[in-house]
Amino acid sequence: MKNNHNLIYLQELNINDVNRNYVKWLNDYSVVRFTEQKFYKHTIKSVKKFVIEKKKEKDEFLLGIFLSNKKIHVGNIKLGPINYKHKYAEISYFIGEKKFQNLGLGSLAIKKVCKIAKTQYKLKKLIAGVYEKNIPSKKVLEKNKFILEGFISKKYLFEGRRISELIYGKLF
């Protein structure tokens, strides 16, 4: 897939975006393997509640990743929490729709959220924490000029082993 910004758009999620397919992603271990979502059993009710809670937040923004041509929800990217005093935020993301994984959509979403962070919120830095075994996420961050800044040794219990969290950052 060529690097085309118009392939996707980001839009704040609302409860109408919560459907069986979205909940199915969150309950699919292969999709959420490298996220903390793997520890929860999700339902339409619980996901709608989460979306409502995020919409109330002033420092976190849960955005859906949608295909532009079909308006299909394929994943999420979250900006926040934002630290307005120090002008930085964290990001987290995933492509839930398996047939759209490994096509560069996550990279495009990160590029778009970087632009939002810089222009709309006047942030100076973004941070992303990654399980050390999550090679695709490391690649997508590095493609977007995030730099490995450090790690927290043996932070997570992952598939029976302790692994580290890698901390990536990008300055604007």
Regions found by a protein language model. Give the residues of each.
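A short helix-loop-beta-strand connector motif used in the catalytic cores of GNAT acetyltransferases and
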Residues: 52-64
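Acyl-donor (CoA/ACP) binding surface of acyl/acetyltransferases
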Residues: 1-13, 17-18, 28, 62, ...
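Conserved catalytic core of Hanks-type protein kinase domains
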Residues: 24-25
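Conserved GNAT-fold acetyl-CoA-binding loop/helix
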Residues: 30-51
